[in-house]
Amino acid sequence: MLFRSGTLPYSVSIADGLRAELADAGTEVTAADGADLVVLRATDGIGEFGPFRHQDWGTSVQCPLPVHTLQSVENGKYLTLTGEGDTEIEALADTPDGWFVKELWEFEAVSGDGAAEGLAGEPLLLRSNAPHSRKYARIDRATGRLVADAENPADATRFSLEPVTSGIHEASELAASADRVVLVLGNDPHINGRETVDRDGLALPPQQERLLHEVLTANPNVVLVIVSSYPYAIDRAADQVPAILWTSHAGQELGSAVAHVLTGRHNPSGRLPQTWYSGSAVLPAREDYDVIGSGWTYRYSRAAHVYPFGHGLSYATFEYRSPAATVREETPGALTVVADLTLANTSAVPGHEVVQLYARRIAAQDPSADPNPESEAARTLVGFERIHLGAGESRKVTFEVPQERLEQWSAEKSAKLLPAGEYEFEFSRSSTDPAATVRLELS
């Protein structure tokens, strides 16, 4: 959970959630965390520390550089800054936490040419990623302890990260011996997902990309679970993985909730609150705030995407039948569009469907009077309803769309206006998947 969210009273992991859910069926659930087991050793032989479980998290948001965590095998705690002035380094933290995360470490190349990969025998410098520190680690020769007080690389201890076991190899071996694989990827909101900092890209961290590749190679029967604060570019996974489930970081029962969805005990009905694009290269420049001209948001973007805004699946199937729309005049110059259809559950299981209503103007009565001609084809979400239907059940779904949801800003008149013309109303499963449409003339 994020630093503003309080402290969880307990936490159910996805592995433990699956164990509990599948216990009565006698299904064995085994797990590996994908972390490498390593020893941190001074290259001049004056000391070594560990073993640690090493995770490569990709780019940090507090100082945008590749970062790592080192979790002690002995006590399960993370290597963190402690002591007066945060100049001591000890394995005392339960989790990476806080606004300034003191459990993140950079592996800096001794050559000064950027980040080191932590390869066996490769000399590296250990540097705190915490903005208030940014100090290099060294071994205090008098005490033999790790401290973080070196201002420059010349005063820092050179280390090598000596591998004991490979986390990716362990995970791929486990996958090869399994009937089904649940692979969990994503981010930690303390490390690489919070406000104030934009990401440099949409790709998964390189270590997670490698893990995904090796696990899929070992066993293609994979369900990919992404626990994240934001979208990723997962084109390859979408093409190769049979099923993908996304969730936010949720709360203490995250593991139980995921297990209930994967086993079918709970029928999912969530919808994506943002578009998942195919990569950052297809997006406009981050500093370009011309939303319409540059093609930002689901309304104006023509960029290639993996999943559109509003996308989501269910174990149930639904049909959209008999769409209709009428105009109701409330007062002179103010109208309401009443749109309805019949929604039918055509499957053998109960479920929820999120019916989304989008509106777009397809032809102006007077193009010269159009307050915003470049946004003519933009779809706008004007309503949605989450409907529960039993197996074989059907129900009428009605939307009432007030005029202000259809109005556009006129810079010339400094007011919001309803452009007269022909409008299309789409009953959709997502922003790009209309299931039924109706047209109305509005003036």
Spans of features found by a protein language model:
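Solvent-exposed, conformationally flexible loop/turn segments
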Residues: 65, 332-334, 389-394
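Beta-strand-rich extracellular modules
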Residues: 140-142, 344, 402, 428-430
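Extracellular glycan-recognition/adhesion modules and their associated mucin-like linkers
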Residues: 10, 30-85, 103-143, 160-174
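Short glycine/proline/serine/threonine-rich loop/turn segments at secondary-structure transition edges
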Residues: 405-422
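Intrinsically disordered, low-complexity Pro/Gly/Ser/Thr-rich segments with frequent PxxP/GP/PP motifs
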Residues: 367-409
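Secreted, periplasmic, or luminal enzymes acting at the cell surface/secretory milieu
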Residues: 1-15, 19-25, 32-34, 227-352, ...
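Hydrophobic helix-and-loop "lid/oligomerization" segment in the mid-to-C-terminal part
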Residues: 32-33, 91, 98-99, 153-239
